[in-house]
Curated annotation (Swiss-Prot):
Species name: Lumbricus terrestris (Common earthworm)
UniProt family annotation: Belongs to the globin family.
Highest taxon in the source lineage: Eukaryota
All residue ranges annotated as the Globin domain in the record: 1-142
Protein name (database record): Extracellular globin-1
The keyword Disulfide bond is annotated on this UniProt entry: yes
Gene3D superfamilies in the record: Globins
Amino acid sequence: ECLVTEGLKVKLQWASAFGHAHQRVAFGLELWKGILREHPEIKAPFSRVRGDNIYSPQFGAHSQRVLSGLDITISMLDTPDMLAAQLAHLKVQHVERNLKPEFFDIFLKHLLHVLGDRLGTHFDFGAWHDCVDQIIDGIKDI
C-alpha cells in the first residue's frame, strides 16, 4: 500500500530523478539499456517501435510515452479517484498489447535501479516499491 506520505516523497524524488528535457531522454536510455541487456526477449513486443534499436527516434518516442505515463500516474498518487481512472485506461492499452505480467516486474526492478543511481542516499526504496507496485498492479493483466 502506498501511504500518503510515501506518495508525496515519491512525487518529489521523481521530479528530481526524471528532470527536464534531455535529462528525461537520458533517463529512458539508461532504463531501457538495462532492461534489454538483461532481457533481450523483451525486444520482440516492441518491434513496432524499433525495440532492436533504443537509439532510434521511434524507440525514443516510445520510451518517453512510457515514462510520461509513469509521470502522470505518479502525479496522481494523492488523488485516488483520478489515479484509478488513469490506471484503468493504461490497463486497457497494455492488455491490448498482450504484455506478459513478468515484463512489469522487470520494468520495476530496472526502474528502481536507475532511481537509486540518480537519487543516491535520498532514494526511499520502500516508498518507491509500495507506490510503484500500486501503479503496476493497476495496469498489468494478472
